[in-house]
Curated annotation (Swiss-Prot):
Forms homodimers. Interacts with ubiquitin-protein ligase UBE3A/E6-AP; this interaction stimulates UBE3A ubiquitin activity. Interacts with host TP53 and EP300; this interaction inhibits TP53 activity. The gene is E6. It is found in: Host cytoplasm; Host nucleus. InterPro entries: E6, E6_sf. Keywords: Activator, DNA-binding, Early protein, Host cytoplasm, Host nucleus, Host-virus interaction, Inhibition of host innate immune response by virus, Metal-binding, Modulation of host cell apoptosis by virus, Transcription, Transcription regulation, Viral immunoevasion, Zinc, Zinc-finger. This is Protein E6. It comes from the Viruses. It comes from Human papillomavirus 27. One of its GO terms (cellular component) is host cell nucleus. Belongs to the papillomaviridae E6 protein family. Gene3D superfamilies: E6 early regulatory protein (3.30.240.40).
């Protein structure tokens, strides 16, 4: 196993943010990461969101990187435009995968948060489509879904 200076032999580049903190003896609130996309420092809120979303730490030249919220959304949109294959309803996803929707691991295609059972259920009950992007099934979380379906303020009429 290859090792890098100052890193343990057991896991030189932990991809989980909590394992990274443990390996270096840091608390999550003391961790400082740069965004892999824009190279700016992640705010405390960005680090916490990165952890909650269970995203993987990216290593470049021996240094760990995360992703800020703005870049995650931009990267999600780019992935959606470049790698969208098709969209379909839940029963089709279950038929194609052979796995019930509640058991499938899915992320929000906008913010990348893992979808909860309730969010998947809301998509099924609301007869919303799931999207195959980069070969993975995705949907939208409740937070991003509400922003996607909110009426356009410009289209409101005055009474």
């Amino acid at each position: 196993m290859r090792t890098r200076a100052g890193m343990s032999e057991e896991n030189p580049c932990p991809r989980n943010i909590f394992l990274l903190c443990k390996q270096y003896g840091l608390e999550l609130e003391d961790l400082r990461l740069l965004c892999v996309y824009c190279r700016r420092a992640l705010s405390d809120a960005d680090v916490l969101a990165f952890a909650i979303k269970e995203l993987s730490v990216v290593w470049r030249k021996g240094f760990p990187f995360g992703a800020c919220g703005k870049c995650l959304i931009a990267a999600g949109k780019l992935r959606q435009y470049r790698h969208w294959h098709y969209s379909c309803y839940g029963d089709t996803v279950e038929t194609e995968t052979g796995i019930p929707i509640p058991q499938l691991f899915m992320r929000c295609y906008i913010c990348h948060k893992p979808l909860s059972w309730e969010e998947k259920e809301a998509l099924l009950v609301g007869n919303k489509r799931f999207h195959n992007i980069s070969g993975r099934w995705t949907g939208h979380c409740m937070q991003c879904g509400s922003t996607c379906t909110a009426p356009d303020p410009a289209s409101r009429t005055l009474h």
